[in-house]
Amino acid sequence: MTEPLDAALRPKSLAEYVGQARLKEKLGVYLQAAKGRKEALDHTLLFGPPGLGKTTLAHIIAAELGVNIRVTSGPAIEKPGDLAAILTNSLEEGDVLFIDEIHRLGRVAEEHLYPAMEDFKLDIVLGQGPAARTIELPLPRFTLVGATTRPGLITAPMRSRFGIIEHLEYYTPEEIGTNLLRDARLLGFGLTEEAAIEIGARSRGTMRIAKRLLRRVRDYADVAGEKTIELERAQDALDKLGLDTAGLDERDKKYLETLIHRFAGGPVGVDTLATAISEDALTLEDVYEPYLIQLGFIKRTPRGRVATAHAYDHLGLPVGAAESDLGLYTN
């Protein structure tokens, strides 16, 4: 599946978007009000784990408003000149500017963004030293949609300039299944509801992962000469992909087993845990831990990470299991 096809499968309206019910309801009100007043939507910050649809929602916002969208990312805007080029050359009245990973925006560029967000003007410095002068460029009234997986890294001045701040939640297996059935229909292959929900249940509550898994399960079905993906085929393919019934892969299980085995279930600091499993701390915090916390398998405490009774149960271990119970790291 190519990138343009991925874009073609995206929902084009709030009505087509499955999940995030509370967010959809609120966003629908904000969009309707903005259209009724013929105003740009307030600047919007969307945050949550990767793959939950922040980019898709940004495109939906633009589509619902009937305006264009300009897509960029925080790391791509290093200097004020980068920002000026986007704001002065790419945007028309009411357009949406989507900045992914906005927490990685350069600090100087961020400070130049403040007057653009508040007063729709951009201050440009011409020349250097005593001869330098500042000119003020008017900008069209636009909507900035920022997306981040790390809201704690958004500075207070930046956060205060967003009129709408919303968190995206993990999806239920049923919500993911509904979306996958739509994808299968658009792509012209069969998928039963039971198989779709099974894929959803092993997708970490994340739509992006579910779509990737659907492609891989479809590969297995195609090789087997099956035109429709049934539950048994989905289960078999997902098992071969190394995903258990909760959607945990080998890295997730290594995290839990290391926490329980090497550190007696915790508490242990994230840096120490990351070193023990040959991973970096940011990857643990951004990729692995959100879902493990969502499942109730670990807790983040002031003293470090702690495995819960649910984690022991999922691994088939008694709470407080000894090293020999895991059969790992033994001589």
Curated annotation (Swiss-Prot):
Official protein name in the record: Holliday junction branch migration complex subunit RuvB
SMART domains xref list: AAA (SM00382)
Organism lineage: Bacteria, Thermotogati, Deinococcota, Deinococci, Deinococcales
Hydrolase listed as a keyword: yes
UniProt similarity note: Belongs to the RuvB family.
GO MF annotation: an example: ATP hydrolysis activity
Entry EC no(s): 3.6.4.-
Enzyme class: hydrolase
Residue segments, region Small ATPAse domain (RuvB-S): 172-242
Assembly, per entry: Homohexamer. Forms an RuvA(8)-RuvB(12)-Holliday junction (HJ) complex. HJ DNA is sandwiched between 2 RuvA tetramers; dsDNA enters through RuvA and exits via RuvB. An RuvB hexamer assembles on each DNA strand where it exits the tetramer. Each RuvB hexamer is contacted by two RuvA subunits (via domain III) on 2 adjacent RuvB subunits; this complex drives branch migration. In the full resolvosome a probable DNA-RuvA(4)-RuvB(12)-RuvC(2) complex forms which resolves the HJ.
UniProt region (Large ATPase domain (RuvB-L)), positions on chain: 1-171
Membrane among keywords: no
HAMAP family, alphabetized: DNA_HJ_migration_RuvB (MF_00016)
GO cellular component, one term: Holliday junction resolvase complex
PANTHER family per the UniProt record, alphabetical: HOLLIDAY JUNCTION BRANCH MIGRATION COMPLEX SUBUNIT RUVB, PTHR42848
Pfam families linked: AAA_lid_4 (PF17864), RuvB_C (PF05491), RuvB_N (PF05496)
Residues reported to bind DNA: R300, R305
Stretches the record annotates as Head domain (RuvB-H): 245-331
Primary role: The RuvA-RuvB-RuvC complex processes Holliday junction (HJ) DNA during genetic recombination and DNA repair, while the RuvA-RuvB complex plays an important role in the rescue of blocked DNA replication forks via replication fork reversal (RFR). RuvA specifically binds to HJ cruciform DNA, conferring on it an open structure. The RuvB hexamer acts as an ATP-dependent pump, pulling dsDNA into and through the RuvAB complex. RuvB forms 2 homohexamers on either side of HJ DNA bound by 1 or 2 RuvA tetramers; 4 subunits per hexamer contact DNA at a time.
Superkingdom, taxonomy of origin: Bacteria
